Curated annotation (Swiss-Prot):
Any one cellular-component term (Gene Ontology): extracellular region
Lineage of the species this protein comes from: Eukaryota, Metazoa, Ecdysozoa, Arthropoda, Hexapoda
Record-stated family: Belongs to the AKH/HRTH/RPCH family.
Residues recorded as bearing Tryptophan amide in the entry: 8
Keywords from the UniProt entry: Amidation, Hormone, Neuropeptide, Pyrrolidone carboxylic acid, Secreted
UniProt keyword Endoplasmic reticulum present: no
UniProt name for this protein: Hypertrehalosaemic factor
Source taxon at top rank: Eukaryota
Length: 8
């Protein structure tokens, strides 16, 4: 499982 959460 790959989940992308940007830190912007």
């Amino acid at each position: 499982q790959l989940n992308f959460s940007p830190n912007w």
